[in-house]
Regions:
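Short, well-ordered alpha-helical segments enriched in acidic and aromatic residues
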Residues: 78-89
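Central antiparallel beta-sheet cores of small beta-barrel/beta-sandwich binding domains
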Residues: 1-18, 23-40
Length: 158
């Protein structure tokens, strides 16, 4: 098996901390089958009972409301609504390269290049609730969207 990434590793070698899963081939009795394992385990809840205490001082419900607001607006194609839940500049990563979207106007102008049907299909399978937390941010799915205390801060496109 080998580590798989989503482009956010910035050319660094993949390992358990920056990969989104493992892929490879399974061989047995002359049969060959593809194997794909996606990362997505849950973080443990801190002793305080606050899931997002490493991300924000606000309540978990308030933080998730922002993440869900972004998620619902994106899936609805609501550019203005989604921008309300973005922590600009927004980092957009794809194929090992990244760029910054610096404003709501830039997000609107780049919308169709960012929120492609393939990316939307990935997001539709995810749920912004009890998200994993790493390095002071919460991640949706396998790191497809990262949220800071102020809103969506990074997107990792397929």
């Amino acid at each position: 098996l080998k580590f798989t990434g989503n482009g956010s590793e910035g050319g660094k070698p993949l390992d358990f901390t920056n990969s989104v899963g493992l892929e490879g081939t399974w061989f047995k009795d002359g049969k060959t089958l593809p194997v794909k394992l996606a990362a997505g385990g849950q973080s443990s809840v801190p002793a305080s009972g606050r899931w997002y205490e490493m991300v924000t001082d606000e309540s978990d419900a308030a933080f998730e409301a922002k993440a869900q607001g972004f998620y619902k607006a994106v899936l609805a194609g609501d550019k203005t609504g989604a921008a309300k839940y973005v922590d600009f500049p927004l980092r957009v990563n794809q194929n090992g390269k990244g760029h910054l979207v610096r404003s709501a106007a830039e997000l609107s102008a780049q919308w169709d290049r960012i929120f492609t049907p393939a990316y939307l299909d990935i997001l539709k399978k995810e749920m912004p609730h009890d998200m994993s937390v790493s390095k002071g941010q919460a991640m949706l799915g396998a790191g497809d969207v990262w949220f800071s205390s102020k809103g969506a801060s990074a997107l990792n496109l397929p």
